[in-house]
Amino acid sequence: MNFEGLDPSLAEYAPTLHPALDPVLDPHLNPSLLQNVELDPEGVPLEGIAVPESVHIVEGMYSELHTAVSEVGVPVSVSHFDLHEEMLWVGNHGGHATSFFGPTLERYSSFQVNSSDDIRQIQSLESGVLFLTKTNLKCMSRGGLIIFDYLMDEAEDMHSLLLTDSSTLLVGGLQNHVIEIDLNTVQETQKYTVEVPGITIMRQSNRFFFCGHTSGKVSLRDLRTFVVEHEFDAYSGSLSDFDVHGNLLVTCGFSSRMNGLACDRFLKVYDLRMMRATTPLQVHIDPFFLRFIPTYTSRLAIISQTGQCQFCEPTGLANPADIFHVNTVGPLIMTFDVSASKQALAFGDSEGCVHLWADSPEVTFNTYSRETDFALPCIVDTLPHLDWNQDLVPLSLIPVPLTSETLLSDWPAANSAPAPRRAPPVDPEILRTMKKVGFIGYAPNPRTKLRNQIPYRLKEADNEFDSFSQVPESPIGREEEPHLYMVAKKYRKVTIKYSKLGLEDFDFKHYNKTLFAGLEPHIPNAYCNCMIQVLYFLEPVRCLVQNHLCQKEFCLGCELGLLFHMLDLSRGDPCQGSNFLRAFRTIPEASALGLILADSDEATGKVNLGRLIQSWNRFILTQLHQETQEQEGPQAYRGAGSSTFGSSGDSVIGQLFSCEVENCSMCRCGKETVRVSSTLLFTLSYPESAEKPVKDYEFAQILKRSICLEQNTQAWCENCEKYQPTVQTRNIRCLPDVLVINCEVNSSKEADFWKTQAEYAFQRALMKRGGFEITKGKEISLGDWKELGNPEVGHSYPSVEELKNIWIPHAIKMRLTKNKELDVCNWSESDELSPNDDPESVYVYDLMATVVHILDSRTGGSLVGHIKVGETYHQRKEGVTHQQWYLFNDFLIEPVDKCEAVQFDMSWKVPAILYYARRNLNSKYNLVIKNPIEASVLLAEASLARKQRKCHATFIPLMLSEMPQAGDLVGLDAEFVTLNEEEAELRSDGTKSTIKPSQMSVARITCVRGQGPNEGVPFIDDYISTQEQVVDYLTQYSGIKPGDLDAKISSKHLTTLKSTYLKLRFLIDVGVKFVGHGLQKDFRVINLMVPKDQVIDTVYLFHIPRKRMISLRFLAWYFLDLKIQGETHDSIEDARTALQLYRKYLELSQGGSEPDDFRKVLKALYEKGRKLDWKVPEPDSQSSPKHGAVFPPVLAL
C-alpha cells in the first residue's frame, strides 16, 4: 500500500509533508530526468533500460524476473496482484490502468479509468476490478468495460479502500468519515464518523479494522460498529505504511525533527495480545513500504523509496547482508505489492515501469487461479485452398460472404432435384483380390481406410406443415434455426423487456405508430388477444357489450364491455385484459373445453394455438349469446341503465352470427328425420379425395360444401330400432349478418390442400391479368411467362408477391333461392349487386378479419390478426375517412396491404379463423352507446363478509346530495397482493433479467372526499374478495392480512372487484380528479384507463427530472410533520396524506412571489433526503423541518 501523501511528484499535495525528498526528482517538474531514457510503450525494453536478458534465480531468494512498461514517463501510483487470475494490475498518475498476464508480464489489457485524477488503489473481485480515484469508485471488467461508476462529492479526497466481505466495501480518505458501500446495489449503506481525519491505509484481521492516519496514529476499530477500541501513536510526524500478521503490528513512518519530517529507521512493533509496543526494529535503509511475507517464518519486506529492499524477522536484528537493490529506471519506487501466494513481489517506479521479483522461474501469483479469457486471434483474410477432386473436403472451408441477395441454394426444392456425388471408384486392390460366387464378390480388407469411416448424414427434421424446403434471403443463422428467419419480423412473438423501472422505460411507440390500442401479452391466457381485437372492431358487438351490465360477478359480456371502453379511451397506449381474463378463468365451461392454459404449456408451446383459438372462438360467441340473451329486471345490475339493443330476451349476438339450419337424416329404410337448430359459425370441410394431383377448387365451392354438409354416418333409427348407415345433410334457412369460419387446418393434409389451391389461384390470376384464356389444370409455359413480363406484347407485369399464397377472396356473394338452396361464388370488393338481385335474399360479404397461427419452434408460436378497420372507427379515432387493413400482434400494430391479409405461407403462417361481414352492416344496427353505469353504484351496499359489523365500518357512503361533479377532488389509494411471483434469470455477467413480472391483484381500494365539510372522510373502503390463490399478502406494505379477503372469516367490508370497479368507472365518467401517490401503478393493476387530465399524482408534483422518486412517507414527514406508514400501510391514511400534500403543493407553487421559489423548495427537499439517506428519522433523533398540518384534522369515524 502506497501512502501517496508523502510523494512529492504529486503537485496537489503540499511538499512540506516530506521535505527529505527533493522535488527535482519529480519527472513532471524536472523533464531532464527523461532525456537519456527511451522506452517502448508496449512494454518491450529498448536502449537505455538495463534489464538482464536471462536471470539466474536461486530457490528461496527473491530476484528480479521481468520488467514491463505501463506508460512511458508517467509514474506508477499503485500495483495489485489479481486475487482470482494470474494477472498484475498497475495504475498510474494519469488515471490509466494496465494489466499484465503471468510471470512473463504479457500485456493483457490497457484502458483509461479517469481522465484527470490518479489511481490510488486497486482491488480485484470475481466479476471485475475496483479502481479508486480522488472522488470516484469505478468497477470495470478485466477487459475494460464499465460495470458501474460511483461518483462521490467533489469535496471528498479518497485514498484507501478495504473489501470487508464479498459485497461490502469501506472507503476512506482525508475527510472525517468512512463510507460503507454495498457492491450489489452500488449504494452507500453507512457513513462512519472518524474522530481523527486522514485515513490513508486500511487493513483487516479477524478481530479489528486497522486504520492508518496521516497524523502518525494507528486506530483499531470494532468490526461491526467501527468504534475505536485501541489506538497507537506510532510517529510524531506521519505514517508511511504498516502491516498486520497474527498478533504483530509493524509500522514505518516519519518523525518531526527541526521543524521538518525525517524518515525514521526504527520500525515500531506492537503486540496485539497485550496491546502495547515491544522492542522497535532498527533497519539499515529508509523504510517507506513494508509487508509481511509469511512462508516458513514471518519475514518482513522493507522497501525504501530509492529502491533498496531488506528482508528481516520482526523480532530479530536486521542484517546488512540481506539488502537488495531494485534496478529501477526512474529514481523513486512509488508502489509495492506482494502476491497472495507470497512467491512474487511487484515494484512500480516513477518512470512508469513495473518490476517483478520472484523466488522461482515458474512463479504463480495465486494458489488456485481460474483460467483467463483471451481475445480471439484475428482471422487471416487469405482463403484456404480447396481441392475439388477430394471427396472428403468440406465446402464450408471457404466462408460464404454476407449478403442480402437470394443465393442459388435458396432455389425452392420443388424446382430442383438432388444430384449426389458419384460413388468413389473401388480400390484397385479390392478388385484385384476379389473372388466371386455367382453375382456376389468379396475381398479381404486392404487396410487402406480408417475403421468406422462412413459418410455423415444430418438427421432430417420433419415439419408438420413443411412439404418443401425454404430458407431466408440472408444466410446468417440458416443452420441454427431456419424457420425463425422465414417469419417476417413483425409477425414474430413480441415480448416486453422489463428493466429496474418496470415498464416505464419500455418504448411501446416503437411497435405502434397508430392511435389504436394494443393488448399486453404477459397475462396468463392472453393468447386470445387477437380475437378480442376482432370482436372490438365489429361495431355492433362493441356497442352491444358496452351497453350491457348485469349482476353476475364473472360475466364475460360485462368485462368485455369495460375492456372495450379502455380501448376507446386509449390514444396508442397498450391496455391489458387482466380483469376479462380473470373472469374467463372462473368459467367452468372454459376449463372443461381445455381453454385455460397453464403457464408452462403457454411458454413451451406444447399447445396447438391454431386449434385452441378456434375452440375459443366458438366458446366466446356461445357465451356472449347466452349472457346477452338473459332477461333484464332481476338480472339487471342495480346501477345499470336500460339497454338500447332489442327487446327482452332478444340477443344481438344471435342476430349477427346465428344461422338457422335444418339437419336431415335419411335411413336406408326410407325414414327421414328433420331437426332444426342454430349455429354461430361454420367449420371448413375439405374433400377427402385421394386423387393426385388435387383438383382445382374455388374457395366458394369449399365454403358451400362446408355449410351444406353431406356425410354418411351410423345413427339410431327409430323405425329399424338399431343403428343404421344414415345420410345426414345440412341446409340453411337464413343467412347470418356476420359469417364466421373456422379453417380447421390442423394437419399437413389440410395444409397441402391450401397450398395446392393457392398455386392454382396464382396461375389463374396471372393468366387473367395477362389476357390468357383461363383453363383449369393448364400450366404456364416459360414463353408465356416471358410474354407476361414483356411490355412490347402489351401486358403489364403483375406483382408476383401480391399473387402468391392467395386462395380466399376479399368478398363472397351468397344467395338463398326460393327452394332454400344456397349459391356461393367468389366476389370482388368493387363489384356491386345487379338490379335483378334481391337485397333481402342476396348477401355480399366483405372480408373484415383473418386470424392466423404463426409457426415458430423457438418461441412456441403465436397468434396474430389482420383486421380491416372501417371508416366509422377511423373517423372517431384519427379524424380521417378511409378503410385500411392492420396487423395486430399483441401491442404491435402496423398497417398492411390487403393482399398480405389473405396470403398464407403454410410453412409458417397458417389460417385459423375468417370473419366475413355483410356489406353495409352498421346501417342495420343502432350503434349508440348509452353508459349503463349510474350514480346508484355509489350508494351503500351490503358486505359479502359474514362477520362484518356496522360498528367496524371505516367509511361513510355518499349521500345523493354529495354526488361528485366534474372537477371535484377524490383522494385514492389502493393496496395489492401477489398471485404469482416474478420469473427472473441471472445472466452470465451477474445481472438480473426479469422474464415475467409478478402478477398483482387489487385487495383494497379507498376513496376519500376531497372537499366539503367532510373533507378527508372516506366514502369507499372496499376489500376485494378473491377466489384465486394468494402467494404473498405483502402485509408490511399493504396492511392486508390472511383472512381479510375470505368472505367466511373476514371482518372487513368485502365486495367483488366488479362492484368497486364500477364505482371508479362512474367517478371517471363524471370527470372527478383523482389525487394520490403512485397512481399509475394503482390504475394499471386495477385495470383502469384514466385520462391524464383527471390524475394528480403527488409523486410527480414533488419530483425533479432525472432524480429519484420520493416516497409518500418522506414527503409527509418533510412537508406535513406527519409520521405515517409505521408498521404497515393504511390506504385511508395514505389517501388523506396525498390530499394534504396536494394542498401544500398549491400553497408552495402558487403562493411564491418568484417562479423559481418552488424549485428551491424541491432542491432543499432533495438535499435533506440525501443527507438522511431518504429515511425518516426517529422522533428522539431529529425533529421534522415543518410544524403543523396543512388543514385541520378530518372527521373521525
UniProtKB/Swiss-Prot annotation:
GO molecular function, one term: metal ion binding
Cofactor binding remark: Binds 2 metal cations per subunit in the catalytic exonuclease domain.
WD repeat spans: 153-193, 195-231, 244-280, 328-367
Single Gene Ontology BP annotation: positive regulation of cytoplasmic mRNA processing body assembly
Residue span, Exonuclease domain: 970-1142
PROSITE patterns registered for this protein in UniProt: USP_3
GO cellular component: nucleus; P-body; PAN complex
Region (Disordered): 1176-1197
A Pfam family this chain is assigned to: RNase_T
Top enzyme class: hydrolase
Amino-acid positions noted as binding a divalent metal cation in the UniProt annotation, renumbered to this chain: D973, E975, D1082, D1134
Domain USP per the UniProt entry, residue ranges: 486-919
Catalytic activity annotation: Exonucleolytic cleavage of poly(A) to 5'-AMP
Record EC number: 3.1.13.4
Places the protein is found: Cytoplasm, P-body; Nucleus
Keywords tagged on the record: Cytoplasm, Exonuclease, Hydrolase, Metal-binding, mRNA processing, Nuclease, Nucleus, Repeat, WD repeat
Region Linker: start-end pairs: 368-485
Domain topic, free-text comment: Contains a pseudo-UCH domain. This ubiquitin C-terminal hydrolase (UCH)-like or ubiquitin specific protease (USP)-like domain is predicted to be catalytically inactive because it lacks the active site catalytic triad characteristic of thiol proteases, with residues at the equivalent structural positions that are incompatible with catalysis, and it cannot bind ubiquitin. It functions as a structural scaffold for intra- and intermolecular interactions in the complex.
Quaternary structure note: Forms a heterotrimer with an asymmetric homodimer of the regulatory subunit PAN3 to form the poly(A)-nuclease (PAN) deadenylation complex.
Function: Catalytic subunit of the poly(A)-nuclease (PAN) deadenylation complex, one of two cytoplasmic mRNA deadenylases involved in general and miRNA-mediated mRNA turnover. PAN specifically shortens poly(A) tails of RNA and the activity is stimulated by poly(A)-binding protein (PABP). PAN deadenylation is followed by rapid degradation of the shortened mRNA tails by the CCR4-NOT complex.
Family membership noted in the UniProt record: Belongs to the peptidase C19 family. PAN2 subfamily.
Identification of the protein by name: PAN2-PAN3 deadenylation complex catalytic subunit PAN2
The organism of origin for this protein: Gallus gallus (Chicken)
Gene field: PAN2
